Amino acid sequence: MPKTINVRVTTMDAELEFAIQPNTTGKQLFDQVVKTIGLREVWFFGLQYQDTKGFSTWLKLNKKVTAQDVRKESPLLFKFRAKFYPEDVSEELIQDITQRLFFLQVKEGILNDDIYCPPETAVLLASYAVQSKYGDFNKEVHKSGYLAGDKLLPQRVLEQHKLNKDQWEERIQVWHEEHRGMLREDAVLEYLKIAQDLEMYGVNYFSSKNKKGSELWLGVDALGLNIYEQNDRLTPKIGFPWSEIRNISFNDKKFVIKPIDKKAPDFVFYAPRLRINKRILALCMGNHELYMRRRKPDTIEVQQMKAQAREEKHQKQMERALLENEKKKREMAEKEKEKIEREKEELMERLKQIEEQTKKAQQELEEQTRRALALEQERKRAQSEAEKLAKERQEAEEAKEALLKASRDQKKTQEQLALEMAELTARISQLEMARQKKESEAAEWQQKAQMVQEDLEKTRAELKTAMSTPHGAEPAENDQDEQDENGAEASADLRADAMAKDRSEEERTTEAEKNERVQKHLKALTSELANARDESKKTANDMIHAENMRLGRDKYKTLRQIRQGNTKQRIDEFESM
């Protein structure tokens, strides 16, 4: 039995290992990969490997894996990557897995600066990336430093602004909070909808020359072929949609494109190596095929996939709504519990105050009772003294009578009697004054005792009221062999049909232009970052982008502009560059 060969395939977020037979074809390996990860939109993808000369190459599906120039390592190493890009991610990418693989690949391109992204857009995209990873911002979970382990911005952007890690996190967090309620899958799609408007998104650049020998860039993407000047890969100067191209071929390093317009000359350019022309041919054929397919009704398979995706999305939205409803109920219950706890604490505090007031009133009552008893004793003493004085007065009166009688009986002398009489009269007068004084004191003590009694009755009434106040019930708790240098020529006819005239891509607008929310966010970020920007660190791409913005250009306005005039005029313009 033939010995099996170990293969390792790395996707954007996983590492897969297989054992294949020596006669296994590229397609058989590819099919095994897509089946393993559950991918059905296979037409965008391919298997990439590094050949024996160190060049990155796409695996041919119709040839055996072992017959291709794969480095003889164990295991054999491949990368599963997007080879072709959609025109519009929201219309073409159906499965969540497809969207996620594109998201991760595009994000990697932006962070590595293979796709130029202006600072404000980079921060906004970072916030969508954070939403797709962490879900809704939660201050209880996402504490300061929660983004410390994530690479979210291109190094160029970090170096161009005088902001530290914490300040970058604060800015990204603000926009992360803005996406509350957005599903992680929707955040991925929003990221791609903005990223696809970047000028370098989905473009394969190849160094080339025209007949004059001018150094230019040829850009191959989902919409056609574009020509760029050597120092500007953001702004194409001439464009040819796939619908204008009839045949593409190469002979050694010479690449020839025949337009559908018979009056137009061939579009000829020269590549530095034969292998580059082979790659260009393969990319042109694949992109043209997808361009034409998009302009026809969906196949039954695609219709079924879209229907299934809609159903799955609807189900997720239902589940999300249910979760949100449960979350709101839980939050309301927690708030109600907090309210009850708060009211309970307030009642306990009120009860404590009442108890203190009651205790204070009880003490005052005891003090007033003590004072009342003391006054009552003082009153009794004064009354006793008054009675004693009254008795002495009576005795004096009796003595006076006795003296009068004695004077009559004993016939005392008038002088002696007068003297005794005067003494007794004086004594009677003194006793009367003393009696009146004591009666006055007794009346005064009686009045004070009466006042204390009234205060005592008032305090008893207040205490009774405080003790009868209700305290409340206790609250309840709640997818041509590039290495084959012998095959020096190849040709491919690009079929066209009635749908070829559909150039709807020229009518597109950017996500920022049609989405007011995105436009508002980008404007705010531009203003916010301006103060921290170090103008001395601007790159050539930054300056080109700024000039395009000043002139009101964007990807689609530029596309309309570079396709103006007939095919012949644009080919003549290319030859004169």
UniProtKB/Swiss-Prot annotation:
Phosphotyrosine, modified sites: Y116
Keyword RNA-binding: no
Phosphoserine modifications at: S74, S407, S527
Residues with the S-nitrosocysteine modification: C117
Biased composition (Basic and acidic residues): 376-414, 492-518
GO biological process, alphabetically ordered: immunological synapse formation; positive regulation of early endosome to late endosome transport; positive regulation of protein localization to early endosome; regulation of cell shape; regulation of organelle assembly; T cell aggregation; T cell migration; T cell proliferation
Domain FERM: 2-295
Biased composition (Acidic residues): 476-487
Residue interval(s) of motif [IL]-x-C-x-x-[DE] motif: 115-120
Pfam family, one: FERM_C
SMART domains membership: B41, FERM_C
Record keywords: Acetylation, Cell membrane, Cell projection, Cytoplasm, Cytoskeleton, Membrane, Phosphoprotein, S-nitrosylation
Cellular component terms per the entry's GO annotation: adherens junction; apical part of cell; apical plasma membrane; cytoplasm; cytoskeleton; filopodium; microvillus; microvillus membrane
Cited CDD domains: FERM_B-lobe (cd14473), FERM_C_ERM (cd13194), FERM_F1_ERM (cd17187)
Molecular function GO labels: actin binding; cell adhesion molecule binding
Post-translational modification N6-acetyllysine, affected residues: K79, K139, K165
Subcellular location: Cell membrane; Cytoplasm, Cytoskeleton; Apical cell membrane; Cell projection, Microvillus membrane
Entry-annotated residues carrying N6-succinyllysine: K83
Span list, region Disordered: 376-415, 434-518
Cited InterPro entries: Band_41_domain, ERM, ERM_C_dom, ERM_FERM_C, ERM_helical, Ez/rad/moesin-like, FERM/acyl-CoA-bd_prot_sf, FERM_2
UniProt modified residues of type Phosphothreonine: T558
Membrane topology (UniProt): Peripheral membrane protein
Quaternary structure (record): Binds NHERF1. In resting T-cells, part of a PAG1-NHERF1-MSN complex which is disrupted upon TCR activation. Interacts with PPP1R16B. Interacts with PDZD8. Interacts with SELPLG and SYK; mediates the activation of SYK by SELPLG. Interacts with PDPN (via cytoplasmic domain); activates RHOA and promotes epithelial-mesenchymal transition. Interacts with SPN/CD43 cytoplasmic tail, CD44 and ICAM2.
Entry note about domains: The [IL]-x-C-x-x-[DE] motif is a proposed target motif for cysteine S-nitrosylation mediated by the iNOS-S100A8/A9 transnitrosylase complex.
UniProt-recorded name of the protein: Moesin
Organismal lineage: Eukaryota, Metazoa, Chordata, Craniata, Vertebrata
